[in-house]
């Protein structure tokens, strides 16, 4: 993960990827995961997303992973939550990890300040589903295969609600990056059944003139 790049983006306030409102596709399609109330939902590269607030109010515990500590701090400040902060040493690479944990709407929100590749399933605990709105599309092509494998490992092949964007990558540098259906299949087809729930026209704040299609996917455990 490119720590310096993301640290600089947050420091300079260049966080156009952050949405001030809950993502409507989360509200519309989350039920397709068919999770029991109280289940734990993993939100990779979570930033300070208010989607995590929605998940807690809907009755789910949240486990977020974020590289930039100021983003995690901002989430708890903006939600008026005083977190408990604990430090750990990563068994994967020896780096220092921080876990911020607090309560919202009776649910536990646990946000890890860490490179996602430094975490293990043992560290984060059991995961019932993954909500990926802005993680896969934030990563360059050479990182995505390893990322998809890490998510598979961290979640023990839990189902995913995944949002991607598709546009002419030659007309704009990412992030967010364009991801085709063929690329998605390369990343996930070995372990998941991939179902498209919706596609619709969208826009990018940094390139309003660009033709963009947003896709919503359900990734369920491959039964083969």
Report each predicted region and the residues it spans.
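Class I (Rossmann-like) S-adenosyl-L-methionine-dependent methyltransferase catalytic domain
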Residues: 1-34, 48-52, 64-123, 148-150, ...
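Short helix-loop-beta connector
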Residues: 34-40
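Local beta-strand N-terminus motif with an aromatic residue
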Residues: 38, 109, 126-127, 135
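Class I SAM-dependent methyltransferase "Motif I" SAM/SAH-binding loop
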Residues: 42-47, 135
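Gly/Ala-rich phosphate-binding loop of Rossmann-like dinucleotide-binding domains
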Residues: 56-57
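Conserved acetyl-CoA-binding loop of GNAT-fold acetyltransferases
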Residues: 60
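A short SAM/SAH-binding and catalytic strip from SAM-dependent methyltransferases
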Residues: 116-118, 127-142
